[in-house]
Amino acid sequence: MSPNACNLSCMTQNDLLSGLREALRAELKSGVEALRFMAEIERRKLYVERGFSSLFRFCVEGLGLTEDQACRRVAVVRAARRVPEVFELLANGELHMTGVAKLSKFMNDDNAHSLVEQARNKSKAEVEMLIATEFPGAKSCEDRVEAATLETFAFHFDGSAEAKALLDRAKELTPAGTDIGEIFEAALALYVDKLEKRKNGKTSRPRSKPAEDAPAGAAYVPAATRRAVVERDGARCTYVSPDGRRCSERSNLEFDHVGGRALGAKSVVGELRLLCRAHNLHAAREVQGHGFIARRIRAARAARTGQGPWNREPHGG
């Protein structure tokens, strides 16, 4: 028997109960402290240079958290960005991570403080009831995919009435006995094929070879060139960190002009690479500076909110 086990076995009932409470308080405190570290890492985007496309990827691939653990923590960090008091309320037990993570999906600058206040001292079920009351159209279950066997998976998600009607029609058009999984797989195959044609220039009958020359600074990337770059890069972000870690991101990839299109890079295979959004911005900062990217981000936000200079009333004179 280990010394720790011996110490526990020799404790009185009261000592065991008080020891457990103390251990749980320490666990809660250390958990909130970890969240504070994550929030600062997110603010500085420290994970980007180290080869991760997001805080979520860093938590899973860099820290070894499960996807569920990472999702909850990232959601809490984002909620705390709007309501910094979240950390203190978590530490003293007035909020719990599960509830904050659920609420985070519905928070905006206008309702964040109100939602946090309403969620104080509420159980998970009560937080879910709060969400159902405040957001009647909210999904009743979380999207998730779980392994059912070694080769099959169980999918859980909410769908619209239109999706149900499409499924019913698909069942009518397929042979009797075709299960929903087969219909779902066939529909996804068609959808993926459509997206690959649109985003990567994929086609069953390529009509041309990649261009060997193109005007400097040209924004348009021909389909044949896109196909060649995607194939060469393995449909994956090509960023490699200083310690040799290649980014694993395969979603929302962008064609980056090596050295910067604004500085004369051409839309040819040898001067293009695939980067995820985070590493494309990182590369742009390296080439054009933080100020340039900050101005672009501000301009994009202003355009979305209708506050850009092009939307202002002209001055009289």
What are these regions (language model features)?
Residues 1-63:
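N-terminal acidic-hydrophobic amphipathic loop/helix motif that frequently occurs adjacent to catalytic
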Residues 1-12, 18-21, 31-34, 117-317:
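A boundary/linker detector
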Residues 13, 27, 31, 76-79, ...:
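Generic alpha-helical segment signature
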Residues 16, 30, 48, 96, ...:
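Residue-level recognition of alpha-helical structural elements
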Residues 26, 30, 47-51, 61-63, ...:
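Secondary-structure capping and boundary motifs in well-ordered enzyme cores
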Residues 42, 74, 81, 131, ...:
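DNA major-groove recognition helix of helix-turn-helix
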Residues 52-125, 133, 148-149, 156, ...:
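Amphipathic alpha-helical "recognition" segments
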